[in-house]
Amino acid sequence: MIIRDAVHGDIEFNEDEVSIIDTPEVQRLRGIKQLGAASFVYPSATHTRFEHSLGTVFCTQKILNSLSSKYDLDPKLKKIIRISALLHDITHIPFGHTFEDERKLMPRHDKGNRF
């Protein structure tokens, strides 16, 4: 499946990735803004965690392509890395960084475990 992205152009996803993208857990990311409240100041800053996650897969593939030219990477490992990129924001909540950074209601998501 190919998904057309405004930043990266066409991004290709395999059947397993599409089945993950189609889950309610990933689809909920469509409703979470990547930049939280920034769109109140910058009205066009409205991209979502969903769009960001798709773009992360694109960037990850570019890295994998570069590494593959130097190293013999296991196809299964590349598949796991792409899926990890797709799911890296799966636990985000709306305004999550605001709760982490400004209100100190939650530990930072990138500093140790949240669970």
Label for each model-derived stretch:
Residues 1-31:
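Non-catalytic interface/linker regions that flank or bridge core catalytic/transmembrane domains
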Residues 9-20, 36-39, 73-77:
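Short, mixed-charge, low-aromatic patches
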Residues 10, 50-54, 113:
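Generic detection of long, well-ordered alpha-helical segments
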Residues 20, 28-51, 100:
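Active-site flanking loop/helix segments enriched in acidic
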Residues 24, 64-67, 94:
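Short amphipathic alpha-helical segments enriched in hydrophobics
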Residues 41-79:
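Alpha-helical phosphate/pyrophosphate-handling elements in metalloenzyme active cores
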Residues 77-115:
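Divalent metal-dependent catalytic cores for phosphoryl transfer on phosphate-bearing substrates
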